[in-house]
């Protein structure tokens, strides 16, 4: 496997302080991780206070609450990762070992490389979108200030976020600390989201690999042979199902919180673009909206992918077995395998299953809330 294998996830975990080379996913830089969390918390709560100062201003209210929700989600994701880091590290290393063992066979290696290439497309898309949010929050205020300087000869300072800093940001000795603090808060939320969400993508694709390798085993082996082949297949199928179950258990809380808030985030961000006007926050909101859409889609795509690949085992078993030549006893055993495979592996978020229908529900619900906000505005 090439150098790009697990590269996005490894770098993302290292940025937020974890050491992905250890089976326990130990926190290598706790002070840096603490600074990121502190910047998030100190950045989020003033936004809530500022948003609630004038409830009649829906634009200010929705702008600030959309960012507050993302910051809260990133903080929650980090806390979950800290609580479950040993389980996450164990799952990562189990998949590494399974992939290394399977890569000795050329066609198995081809499957592993293809799935990890798909993961890189997903992970890099979200990573680049998240870095776009950071860049927009850092560059847009500067460009707007420079544009004002060109037109009027006066540099008008604007901050990455609109809220009450309790300091006069028009003064240079206050403006630059506020500016850096604001960008760091956005970067912290983005880095923590990248670490968690790209890791979910990698785990999803590499769990899917285990189901795809089972299909290759069905194609390569004579399933009408001895009981050892049936036993080996059932054992590998059990491992794949256990990996999917562990993935669901680890990310259950994260998925639940994400999708309970996601439709509110979408409708609030969309509401901003239904209003006319330009500010330093518009590029930030636009890139933020793109990142949220990619984030939600990647989770639903991953859940649907695992579900469909686990279901495909039943069809593969049925198609590869020569049923007329098989003894009745062995036929019944393989029928039990099919029956188990017809109950798909799923990613649960306590109240819902993460799949493509969930994404449609989020979009429809966000549209309904957007219509409600437009009604309040009128």
Curated annotation (Swiss-Prot):
Claim: Secreted is one of the keywords in the record: no
GO CC terms: cation channel complex; dendrite membrane; plasma membrane
Cytoplasmic side: 1-30, 151-173, 219-249, 307-342
Coiled coil spans: none
Pfam families membership: 7tm_6 (PF02949)
Superkingdom of origin: Eukaryota
UniProt topological domain (Extracellular) ranges: 52-129, 195-197, 271-285, 364-378
Keyword line: Cell membrane, Membrane, Olfaction, Receptor, Sensory transduction, Transducer, Transmembrane, Transmembrane helix
GO molecular function: ionotropic olfactory receptor activity; odorant binding; olfactory receptor activity
Location in the cell: Cell membrane
Assembly with partners or alone: Interacts with Orco. Complexes exist early in the endomembrane system in olfactory sensory neurons (OSNs), coupling these complexes to the conserved ciliary trafficking pathway.
Known role: Odorant receptor which mediates acceptance or avoidance behavior, depending on its substrates. The odorant receptor repertoire encodes a large collection of odor stimuli that vary widely in identity, intensity, and duration. May form a complex with Orco to form odorant-sensing units, providing sensitive and prolonged odorant signaling and calcium permeability. Involved in the behavioral responses to hexanol, pentyl acetate, benzyl acetate, and 2-heptanone.
PANTHER family listed in its UniProt record: ODORANT RECEPTOR, ODORANT RECEPTOR 19A-RELATED
Extra remark: The atypical heteromeric and topological design of the odorant receptors appears to be an insect-specific solution for odor recognition, making the OR/Orco complex an attractive target for the development of highly selective insect repellents to disrupt olfactory-mediated host-seeking behaviors of insect disease vectors. Odor-evoked OR currents are independent of known G-protein-coupled second messenger pathways.
Name of this protein: Odorant receptor 45a
């Amino acid at each position: 496997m090439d150098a790009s294998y697990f590269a996005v996830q490894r770098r993302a975990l290292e940025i937020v302080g974890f050491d992905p080379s250890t089976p326990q996913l130990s926190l290598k830089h706790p002070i840096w991780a603490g600074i990121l969390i502190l910047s998030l918390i100190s950045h989020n709560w003033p936004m809530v206070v500022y948003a609630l100062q004038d409830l009649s201003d829906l634009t200010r209210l929705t702008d600030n609450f959309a960012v507050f929700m993302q910051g809260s989600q990133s903080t929650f994701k980090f806390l979950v990762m800290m609580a479950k880091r040993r389980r996450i590290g164990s799952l990562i290393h189990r998949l590494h070992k399974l992939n290394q063992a399977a890569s000795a066979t050329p066609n198995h290696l081809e499957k592993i490389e293809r799935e990890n290439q798909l993961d890189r497309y997903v992970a890099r898309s979200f990573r680049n979108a998240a870095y776009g949010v950071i860049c927009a929050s850092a560059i847009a205020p500067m460009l707007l200030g420079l544009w004002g300087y060109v037109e009027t000869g006066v540099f008008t300072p604007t901050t990455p976020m609109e809220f009450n800093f309790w300091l006069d940001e028009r003064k240079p000795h206050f403006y630059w600390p506020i500016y850096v603090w604001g960008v760091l808060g956005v970067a912290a939320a983005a880095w923590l989201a990248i670490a968690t969400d790209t890791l979910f993508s990698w785990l999803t694709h590499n769990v899917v690999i285990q189901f795809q390798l089972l299909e290759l085993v069905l194609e390569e082996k004579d399933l009408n042979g001895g009981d050892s082949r049936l036993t080996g297949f059932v054992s590998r199928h059990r491992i794949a199902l256990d990996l999917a179950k562990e993935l669901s258990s680890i990310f259950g809380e994260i998925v639940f919180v994400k999708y309970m808030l996601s439709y509110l985030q979408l409708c609030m961000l969309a509401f901003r673009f239904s209003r006319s006007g330009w500010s330093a926050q518009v590029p930030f909101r636009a890139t933020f909206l793109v990142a949220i859409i990619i984030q939600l889609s990647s989770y639903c795509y991953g859940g649907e992918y695992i579900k469909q690949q686990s279901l495909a085992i039943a069809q593969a078993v049925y198609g590869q077995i020569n049923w007329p030549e098989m003894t009745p006893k062995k036929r019944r055993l393989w029928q039990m395998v099919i029956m188990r495979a017809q109950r798909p592996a799923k990613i649960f978020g306590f109240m819902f299953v993460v799949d493509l229908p969930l994404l449609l529900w989020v979009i429809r619900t966000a549209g309904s809330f957007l219509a409600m906000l437009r009604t309040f505005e009128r």
